[in-house]
A protein has these predicted regions:
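Structural recognition of the conserved hydrophobic beta-strand(s) that form the central parallel beta-sheet
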Residues: 90, 115-121, 142
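Pre-Walker A adenine-sensing motif
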Residues: 1-16
Length: 452
């Protein structure tokens, strides 16, 4: 299995400004495997410490701040060798170990020769607490579910993945690539990007095992809900979680608390929702009132949409059977195209630093699914789960903000093309959105300059 984050980890290793690393990511997204694989590939040896399996190791961080003494005790207790710059030290399951996290300050200041990477589930929750990590003394990195490109690599389709990465002009994709990529994307909707269900499919073609793996991950997340410090929030978190398919099945996907429970109010459930956001189990996309910078200045905090961390988990949570894979475009269009919208958001979050927003207006109603910030430009994005689509909302958006929009973007089942200032990206090329937007802008600017 190949994870593209390994390239980022190598950059971290070679950086002259390297600090201890905290790798964030949801449970079972592949944090431990990635760090161990990184150590295997690029270090002489790896020293691995799991504070959930060996809680007694926590004591070495509670009695001293001397990093040499801490490492000496860990080596004596575990029998593992630690050599500066040649050993990758992995501290796993650190979410309940504030002393371990805080010790990164001393490793950064007093022992930069040691290469340390920390990981843990629910780290977003732990790091949201005051004084839970040393500001400015650590590097952060986020690992998300496997992208469609990574799914192709895991499935043995290196040729398709390489082709997608090689596209350097905006022109239609040949049928020899378009059709198989379209079919592979449908399967990605079924498995999602969590490594275990992907493995069950790519290595064994075992649909039942893949389904069980997805159910197991969902069950693990639901058990984590009970870890909220205020136990009364547990049922609220659970109800919000289970309402997500219903929220996304609506024509207007704006999050409505009454869908969670009849009579529910924001003030009663907002803490529970924030827990899910901090855990990164869901993505919160605010409504923007206008395409301005900084984007946060134009947020309507009372209106937002909620998406799941992974499209495969959403399919399983919504109880959509894998057999939909063989039913034409059903996976793309089922419950108002929610799987497609969720999938596109996943890819945008991994490519763009600023979390996407969406835009809408009433009377008459128009909605642009996402607004993305690329450098200092805002691009409206529409997601269509079919081909031969029209973009009324994109047209309206340009009418309202003609001077702020260089390019409009549409994801659909249509082929790659640039029609005036509308870039159509096939859904299977969503991972290449940033690159394709750049190419489209160059092509558009080139045409404009040729007119003079």
């Amino acid at each position: 299995m190949e994870r593209l984050i390994l390239n980022k980890l190598l950059d971290w290793k070679n950086s002259p400004y390297r600090k201890p690393l905290i790798l964030k990511g949801v449970r079972q997204v592949g944090k431990t495997w990635v760090l161990k694989e990184f150590g295997r590939r690029y270090y002489e040896n790896t020293a691995y410490f799991n504070f959930d399996e060996n809680e007694e190791d926590k004591q070495f961080f509670e009695t001293t701040k001397d990093v040499d003494r801490i490492l000496q005790n860990l080596m004596l207790a575990s029998g593992q060798k630690i050599v500066p710059e040649k050993t990758l030290i992995i501290f796993d399951e650190v979410q309940d170990c504030p002393k371990v996290i805080n010790s990164m300050k001393y490793f950064c200041e007093n022992a930069p020769q040691y290469h340390i990477a920390c990981a843990g589930s629910l780290l977003g929750i732990a790091l949201a607490k005051p004084s839970s990590f040393p500001v400015g003394k650590v590097n952060f990195m986020q690992i998300d579910p496997m992208t469609f490109t990574e799914f192709l690599l895991a499935n043995g389709d290196e040729n398709l993945a390489k082709y997608l990465e090689s596209v350097d002009t905006i022109e239609p994709i040949h049928d020899a690539f378009f059709n198989p990529l379209y079919e592979k994307l449908k399967m990605y909707y079924v498995t999602g990007g969590m490594p275990e269900p992907v493995l069950m499919w790519t290595e064994a073609r075992d649909v039942s095992a893949m389904q069980e793996a997805l159910s197991g991950i969902i069950g693990a997340y639901e058990r984590d809900f009970a870890k909220h410090p205020n136990i009364s929030e547990f049922p609220k978190i659970s109800m919000i979680w289970k309402s997500i398919p219903s929220q996304l099945a609506r024509e207007n996907k704006k999050f409505i608390y009454k869908v969670v429970k009849e009579g529910a109010r924001a003030r009663e459930y907002e803490d529970a929702l924030q827990w899910l956001v901090d855990a990164r189990l869901v993505h919160k996309v605010y409504r923007s009132t206008a395409p301005g910078l900084p984007v946060a200045a134009y947020d309507d905090l009372s209106a937002f949409k909620i998406y799941l961390v992974d499209v495969g988990l959403l399919r399983r949570l919504a109880q959509l059977a894998p057999t939909a894979f063989g039913e034409g475009n059903r996976l793309f269009t089922e419950f108002k195209g929610a799987l497609t919208e969720n999938y596109v958001l996943q890819t945008l979050i991994t490519q763009f630093e600023v979390v996407p927003r969406y835009w809408s207006q009433n009377n008459p109603p128009y909605e642009v699914d996402f607004l993305i910030q690329r450098e200092n430009d805002i691009f409206p994005v529409e997601v269509k789960s079919e081909a031969n689509t029209t973009s009324k909302s994109l047209k309206k958006f340009k009418e309202l903000f003609p001077d702020k929009i260089k390019l409009r973007v549409r994801f659909s089942l249509d082929n790659l093309k640039l029609d005036d200032d509308v870039l159509n990206i096939p859904l299977f090329m969503a991972d290449q959105a940033d690159q394709l937007i750049g190419l489209a802008l160059e092509q558009k600017n080139s045409k404009s300059s040729c007119r003079f």
